[in-house]
Amino acid sequence: NNKIMAKTAFKGTPVTLAGEFVKVETPAPEFTLVKGDLSNYTLKDGKGKYLVLNIFPSMDTGVCATSVRKFNQLAANRPNVTVLAISKDLPFAQGRFCTTEGIANVVPLSDYRYTSDFAQKYGVLMTDGPLAGLLARSVVVINPEGKVVYTELVPEITQEPNYEAALKAVE
């Protein structure tokens, strides 16, 4: 296996990711994540719309919370766009956060149930460092035909993603 492992950093310290970060112009890998009502959400559930996958370690950190709020605003007037907020947080915690923050335009999804199936397929599972086992901060945009059209693996986990670039991908 000579695939190049993706890297990110946490407070300047390099962090290795499992697998290969998903690439632009490739079919989006199938995934199953868990919704707030504990039912499954799959790639097929988002078919026909642009999917903006906002991927991050936990909603309970400042930068992650900010990214969810900003993507919530960006999705407000775009009926052809579904924003998925994806973390390892339990659906209960995700639901509490979204209710407290008035987040209505984002679908919170958890990767807790299927042994990081999503994280492995998309190449966003951190394998070392203090956040090992959590998802690396990244953004993936999938077009209505199911093709990856934009990706960003944020180089430093404590930084916010490039919202404008992600938004351009859905216009």
Language model features: what each stretch is:
Residues 2-171:
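Chalcogenol-based redox active-site neighborhoods
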